């Protein structure tokens, strides 16, 4: 049973180049190099889908393995999903985020896949500590939620552009230009966050799970998740009591919940402490309840909610 704790993070230098399969196309995929053709890409979950669509533009057709409204951490592949991985020209995924996707890539897509982990620089490790004792269940696990720091998506966009360019060299310059345009938009979003969160009465955020470590690090905040790196853990009554004590001790007035999982746990903590609840979306996927139609819209909705919840001026 996971015990909720303050998430402490250690920065680990990432020195290896982008981890991915060889540039050779899959047996089931297209041969590549044909100007004007559509590149079939499979992305494992929404932020990667968004990057591929922005970078590839009209030259790509992107399938998201995670259905709309589904939580991608525990995604289980169907036979159709496995066939899609095999037949794609390119699979873009994040190793360690969804184990079934890792297994599927290893089985049928190793030679036409790109793992974005190294480009994203997963430099935060999640180390839960409670009363001086380390919880070994998740100790030293890399935090995968890099896209909540918009600056980390820039390198991923460049990596995707490079890989698409090897498949379609005739349009490589366009992919590079699209990645640069996305990077400019991400830099603008980063500036909005830095300005919007520069002066807040409370810099401690309490979230339903520990998805916001990169955001917290980038913008000078401290995160505490009620559950660990995945939202499926069920906290015990003792766990909830520890969270309640933390909320009271740090004068937290807002408990943040997500759109893809039940808000029941956040509601329980809020009821015990007198705090209110508000959405803070980890953008692992979109649904009908998402506060925006794409990555940038949801990130800006998150910023607005943080400014209110943290009493920023």
Residue spans of the language-model regions?
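Sec-dependent bacterial lipoprotein signal peptides
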Residues: 1-18
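Extracytoplasmic metal-acquisition and chelation regions
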Residues: 2-4, 20-313
